[in-house]
Amino acid sequence: MKNSHIYILYGSETGTAEGLAESLFRSLTRMGYDVLVNSMDDFNLENLLRPLQCVFICSTTGQGEMPLNMRKFWRFLLRKKLPNTFLNDMQYAVFGCGDTSYTRFNWASKKLDSRLRQLGAQSFSSRGEGDEQHPDGVEGVFAYWCNHLYSQLAAIKTPSRPAFGEFDLLPPSFQIIIDESLGCKVKGFEDNNIVRHSRGKIEATLVHNKRISNIKHWQDVRHLAFKIPNFERWKPGDVAVLYPWNDDMSVNSFIECMGWESIKYSPLIISSNVAERKLPWFPNILNVFNLVKYVLSIHSVPSRTFFEMASHFSNNKMHKERLQEFSSYKNIDDYYDYTTRPRRTVLETLQEFKSVQIPIEYALDAFPVIRGRQYSIANRCDNSTGILELAVALVKYQTILKSPRQGICSRWICDLHENTSFNIDILPGFLNLSYQSNKPLIMVGPGTGVAPLRALIQERIYNGLKENLLFFGCRNKSMDFLFEKDWEKYTEEGTLKLFCAFSRDQEKKKYVQHSIQENGELVYNLLNEKDGMFFVSGSSGKMPSSVKDAIAGIVSKYSGCSISDGYSFVTSLEKKNRYYQETW
């Protein structure tokens, strides 16, 4: 039976690909197409047996890996038993969200496109490659790509119904109704202490929340420790996922902006109006207050889709026109100047556009949901203690706006008291080094990039592997030398060689790549003579490429080869899984 829907399937790690998928869903729905949007792993694989049109939008994570919510789908496509005619009835398009500062730029979308072709699927529109380094970001490239997609799609598929007007309000994707059978204010619904925050699968209790950067340092870095069940397991390189929630003051301000005070504690029943559309996670007690507190991301930067939605619910002509301008790609620079560059939040936007009052029925269409935040686990798994540790640099900075900018998870961690219990998740990382082998391991981890390296060092020491080198970098020895006592202990025991670069402790700035160059002969011998491994962890700015430049230079200097051959040496390490880079 022919499938009349267009499927928009995404693989998203940080929410970018998912946001683009939602935007395309609204655009195609407005054009009159029947559209379904889901993560690839939530897609019903039986649909692949029918003729269908699919648009795939995916990001790349790790070293060219697939995002978590498309791995099941990807594993299915990789089955060797699938014939090369399996997807003969599929017409598809692929858009990748990437960053050219990474070596394997848009690797996931390229691999997906190639595999779909191998299985017989036909591309009806050229593959798009979004780039965070583009002047207009991924969204700018996506908007251009979509215009081409629309014309190509029109050639193969006729809309199912008349198109909506440019400024017509689309029907809500979710049905949100007040459960009148329980009354508007049921006893207990206003008591938020009994809410079970069970979004993750693993019960955790915070036992330690301590600042480990100097109180005088500009950045607050926290060492968090959680007590979790002893049977839980993780490996070096794995990540913990924290699910923050909004503070009560912000929640009440948001509810006041929306005019929802009269239904603040009203119990809700929520279902999907769109076939195969998965509902987000909800707390066990679902009322308006808890929907805003635990589900809606009111401190995120508003998307263009938000402005388009908000324009429908303003009775102020000037506000409506301005909101519509922000929603249009034609005014993308104005949108960036108002939102992205100053990092203005959804709540702050609503406080400025006071005429906007979005009805509760459109809450899940207008506002993004809170996403889990991933942090590298900073200690080895010891089931005798059941303790999981993280090192988290809290995000707080100033823009042109009066109030400091603060990430939702950073805001949450600041107010998180010890003995608070909630659920978390542990996800597998992508570390493909043979770290349990008796080979030297050279590690580079400036700042909180040292967190996964701490777990790795502890694991190797536990297994009796002593040839560990750590190049650590920070601003000042007295300000942000993270886990200093641990490194002192390991060096005294002879299980670690430590090289530090304190960039601001001398007149000329010194970074990790300079420390690597100063110890070039040692690094070269470990890599070339002893088949050593190399692990870079930390910021995705200039550091990773500077480290790679340093290694290439060292190889050239001590082997007598050209600098080009030095880079080829690094590439060969990557291919042999001896050079790993985990940056964010």
Swiss-Prot record:
<feature type="binding site">
    <location>
        <begin position="373"/>
        <end position="376"/>
    </location>
    <ligand>
        <name>FAD</name>
    </ligand>
</feature>
<dbReference type="GO" id="GO:0016491">
    <property type="term" value="F:oxidoreductase activity"/>
</dbReference>
<feature type="binding site">
    <location>
        <begin position="97"/>
        <end position="106"/>
    </location>
    <ligand>
        <name>FMN</name>
    </ligand>
</feature>
<dbReference type="InterPro" id="IPR008254">
    <property type="entry name" value="Flavodoxin/NO_synth"/>
</dbReference>
<dbReference type="GO" id="GO:0005739">
    <property type="term" value="C:mitochondrion"/>
</dbReference>
<dbReference type="Pfam" id="PF00667">
    <property type="entry name" value="FAD_binding_1"/>
</dbReference>
<dbReference type="GO" id="GO:0003958">
    <property type="term" value="F:NADPH-hemoprotein reductase activity"/>
</dbReference>
<keyword id="KW-0496">Mitochondrion</keyword>
<dbReference type="GO" id="GO:0044572">
    <property type="term" value="P:[4Fe-4S] cluster assembly"/>
</dbReference>
<feature type="binding site">
    <location>
        <position position="448"/>
    </location>
    <ligand>
        <name>NADP(+)</name>
    </ligand>
</feature>
<feature type="binding site">
    <location>
        <begin position="407"/>
        <end position="410"/>
    </location>
    <ligand>
        <name>FAD</name>
    </ligand>
</feature>
<keyword id="KW-0963">Cytoplasm</keyword>
<dbReference type="InterPro" id="IPR023173">
    <property type="entry name" value="NADPH_Cyt_P450_Rdtase_alpha"/>
</dbReference>
<dbReference type="GO" id="GO:0050661">
    <property type="term" value="F:NADP binding"/>
</dbReference>
<dbReference type="InterPro" id="IPR001709">
    <property type="entry name" value="Flavoprot_Pyr_Nucl_cyt_Rdtase"/>
</dbReference>
<dbReference type="InterPro" id="IPR039261">
    <property type="entry name" value="FNR_nucleotide-bd"/>
</dbReference>
<feature type="domain" description="FAD-binding FR-type">
    <location>
        <begin position="199"/>
        <end position="436"/>
    </location>
</feature>
<dbReference type="InterPro" id="IPR017927">
    <property type="entry name" value="FAD-bd_FR_type"/>
</dbReference>
<feature type="binding site">
    <location>
        <position position="343"/>
    </location>
    <ligand>
        <name>FAD</name>
    </ligand>
</feature>
<keyword id="KW-0285">Flavoprotein</keyword>
<comment type="similarity">
    <text>In the N-terminal section; belongs to the flavodoxin family.</text>
</comment>
<dbReference type="InterPro" id="IPR001094">
    <property type="entry name" value="Flavdoxin-like"/>
</dbReference>
<feature type="binding site">
    <location>
        <begin position="503"/>
        <end position="504"/>
    </location>
    <ligand>
        <name>NADP(+)</name>
    </ligand>
</feature>
<dbReference type="GO" id="GO:0005829">
    <property type="term" value="C:cytosol"/>
</dbReference>
<protein>
    <recommendedName>
        <fullName>NADPH-dependent diflavin oxidoreductase 1</fullName>
        <ecNumber>1.18.1.-</ecNumber>
    </recommendedName>
</protein>
<feature type="binding site">
    <location>
        <position position="584"/>
    </location>
    <ligand>
        <name>FAD</name>
    </ligand>
</feature>
<dbReference type="InterPro" id="IPR028879">
    <property type="entry name" value="NDOR1"/>
</dbReference>
<feature type="binding site">
    <location>
        <begin position="12"/>
        <end position="17"/>
    </location>
    <ligand>
        <name>FMN</name>
    </ligand>
</feature>
<feature type="domain" description="Flavodoxin-like">
    <location>
        <begin position="6"/>
        <end position="150"/>
    </location>
</feature>
<dbReference type="GO" id="GO:0050660">
    <property type="term" value="F:flavin adenine dinucleotide binding"/>
</dbReference>
<comment type="function">
    <text>NADPH-dependent reductase which is a central component of the cytosolic iron-sulfur (Fe-S) protein assembly (CIA) machinery. Transfers electrons from NADPH via its FAD and FMN prosthetic groups to the [2Fe-2S] cluster of dre2, another key component of the CIA machinery. In turn, this reduced cluster provides electrons for assembly of cytosolic iron-sulfur cluster proteins. Positively controls H(2)O(2)-induced cell death.</text>
</comment>
<keyword id="KW-0274">FAD</keyword>
<feature type="binding site">
    <location>
        <begin position="59"/>
        <end position="62"/>
    </location>
    <ligand>
        <name>FMN</name>
    </ligand>
</feature>
<dbReference type="InterPro" id="IPR001433">
    <property type="entry name" value="OxRdtase_FAD/NAD-bd"/>
</dbReference>
<keyword id="KW-0521">NADP</keyword>
<dbReference type="Pfam" id="PF00258">
    <property type="entry name" value="Flavodoxin_1"/>
</dbReference>
<dbReference type="GO" id="GO:0010181">
    <property type="term" value="F:FMN binding"/>
</dbReference>
<dbReference type="InterPro" id="IPR003097">
    <property type="entry name" value="CysJ-like_FAD-binding"/>
</dbReference>
<feature type="binding site">
    <location>
        <begin position="509"/>
        <end position="513"/>
    </location>
    <ligand>
        <name>NADP(+)</name>
    </ligand>
</feature>
<dbReference type="InterPro" id="IPR017938">
    <property type="entry name" value="Riboflavin_synthase-like_b-brl"/>
</dbReference>
<comment type="subunit">
    <text>Interacts with dre2; as part of the cytosolic iron-sulfur (Fe-S) protein assembly (CIA) machinery.</text>
</comment>
<dbReference type="Pfam" id="PF00175">
    <property type="entry name" value="NAD_binding_1"/>
</dbReference>
